[in-house]
Structures are given as structure tokens and as C-alpha cells.
């Protein structure tokens, strides 16, 4: 059969295509792939793409990291003679698409004991099942665990149960990976220690950047290439996309903060902002930062041709999706879950929407929700040594649902204090008795003038041996 793999433009989608395409290639099948353009097509299947696939005479379309909610699109594929296998990990709606097979760990009739796999985790289960069916050796699917691990950690799924095993074993393979593209992007990220943090903060942003700012094809080609020069060029391109993403994000963030301060938006229960020329690919990241900074739900909209398209982020205890459901008469389209949403609205309805959303937040008594810091233990600086910090690594890999241990330190004296990165971050040295440690507070630079050398403070933080290059 002539096969095409239809994936998403994020790291989970890219790694899903990589694993399935590579596995099929080893079986003698040259499957092609299709990744939608984030800005022009959006997430998931769309009918024009399905019609293009049919026109190119594909017999079988396999979706990865998408498809579970694409009822109409798969119905159209059937009409055009393209058979479909859906593999996905997103929540299942009231009905399933009419596909040959629908593989989703969140199916209500699913007997598999773990529901929290990433999209690439579901693909891994598919190639594992195929390997068993074809009497292949275990190594024929286990060899892809390095790529599966990258997608799993990057998609911020809970790193518990099978995801913990995938990540733990996968990171071991990552350290000795034969994948030239993965080796190259790891080197470009500048991390000496290859752990979940290096993947989350070094590798994932670079792989995601091309999908946000251009087209995700380049990240996929990086994983599939065996050509040294091509890998070098693709890595350089991803680095350029990442720098562009950072600059664009900084511009939107500064613009958003200016709006908040000029219009006293932070006095509202929720922060809803709109801007011309805001890049749709990065406003979700900025919304996360606004929510983190003000501890309020935020929705950012980029305006174009009388339409606002945007992303929202919430705080624990406030269901953003439920709140939007109560305002849906003013919206063209919305989707997502309790903590993160996507939204489309006519520009003329934005002010009315802001008022309605504010009323919903008032009814939910959102002002009574306070930020909570979960502390694992209270310790002294004298308890810290290299062996103690290294012993925490037994709890790795850290990530969603398995956070780094958080410690409380009481009564520390500030020995030095300054801002870093143009006032963005806070750098301190802290003293207790004769013990001194250095500390960094990411995105806490605004506190630099609130404290001075000699002040006594309580600090909540995490411990690590600084290995960043």
C-alpha cells in the first residue's frame, strides 16, 4: 500500500512520525508524511489536506498525535477511498472516527492499564505490537526509545508509570544515540548533563521553534537525516528559528506588560489582551508567563482582518475551558482543557467577551484562589553537600507529576544580590553560619531592589549542581 503518516507540528508529533516512518522503512516500506502548517492550517486533520492526500493516490493514512476528534475529516477520507488508522493520546469525544482502527490510550473501552502516554508513546506501543506480530526481536522497537523519550518529556505528560520507564531507559539511549540529528541538537543546546531538564529546556524549544515560526519539516528532517552537512545546516536553521522565537516572544511580552500597566489590567480577575502583529505561534508561551507573573488566567489574542485568534492559560482551581463554555455565544471557536485553551473571536466581540469572562471569574470567586507552594522538606545549608545533591538524582527523570524536590531554608543572610539578563533574573549568594551557596531566581529580577546585602530571608528552592556550559 502507498502509506502516508499525518502528524502534528510539535515535538510529540515530530518524534511520532520519526519513529513510525523509521520502523516502516526497516520493513521495506517507504512511507511519506504530512505535517500541517501551524498558522495556515492549525492542529489536526483538515479537509483540504485530506483531499490533497487522496489526489496523490495514497491508500492508507496513519495519524499520529492527532485524529481522535477528526470525525468529518476521516469521513471525507473514506469517501475519497483513503483508509485511515488513528493513533492519538488526546481525550476521546462522544463518538469515534470511522477508521480501520482507532488506537488511543484514553478510549473508555481501553483495557490497557496506563492512560497517560504521549502520542509518541502510543506509536511506540503500535510498533511493539507489530514487532510481536512479525516475530521480530525486542531490539527492533527498543532502539527507538531515545526518540520516544524526547517526545514524551517534551509533551509534558506525567512522568510516572510507563512514561517514567520510557524516559529513564530512553535517556540512557539518548546519551549514546546513533541518531546524528539528535546528537547535533543536544550539542547545540549547551547542556553537559543529559537529563529531562536538558530535553525540556534545551532540545524541545529548538525543535518546537520551527513549527512555531515556520514549518516543522526541518525538525523532522533533522531526525531522519544521515548526511553530516545537512544535519549541520538543519541544526543551524533550528537555532536561528529559536532565536527568532525568543525575540518575537520578548517583543509580545513587553507589549503585553505595557498594556497591563497602562490600562490597569492586573486589577481584573482575568487578563485578556489583544495586539496587532502578534505572532500566533508564540502567544501561548507569553500567556503562560503572564499567568505565572500575576497568578491570574490570561488570554492573548492576535488580531488580523477583524478576527482575534489566541491562546489562554489558567491557574490551578479555575477551569478555563468551563469558563469559556459559559461565554461561547461570543466566540467563533474554542477548544482545549482546564489549564490551556485555543480561541477564535470576532474583534467586535472582544470587549463584551472581557466583561462576560470577568463576571464568570467573579461568580467562581477566583480571588479566593491563592498560589500554593508544595514543600518537601525544611533543611539547613549545612545539610547540603555534593553527595546529598547527587543522591536526589535517583528520583530522576523529573518532570510533570514527578517534580524536583522543593526545600525550605529559613533565615538565610543575603551576601550578594544582583540582576542578570537585563534585569530578567535574580542572582544571589546566601549565607547561613559559615556555609555559602549561590542561587538564581528565574524571572525574579524585579525583586532586586526589594532586598539588600545583610537582609535575612526565607527561601524556597530546588538543589542542583550547576553543569550548564
Task: Name what the model sees in each region.
Residues 1-60, 80, 131-355, 374, ...:
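Hydrophobic helix-and-loop "lid/oligomerization" segment in the mid-to-C-terminal part
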Residues 19, 96-136, 141-153:
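Short alpha-helices
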Residues 62, 208, 392, 461:
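A residue-level signal for conserved active-site and pocket-lining positions in enzyme catalytic cores
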Residues 64-117:
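Histidine/acidic-residue-rich, glycine-tolerant segments that coordinate divalent metal ions
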Residues 328-332, 359-366:
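A common structural junction motif
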Residues 379-437:
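Accessory interdomain/linker segments of ATP-dependent helicases and helicase-like nucleic-acid enzymes
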Residues 434-451:
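Beta-strand/loop nucleic-acid-binding surfaces
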Residues 454-468:
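Flexible glycine-rich surface loops and low-complexity tracts that mediate binding to linear polymers
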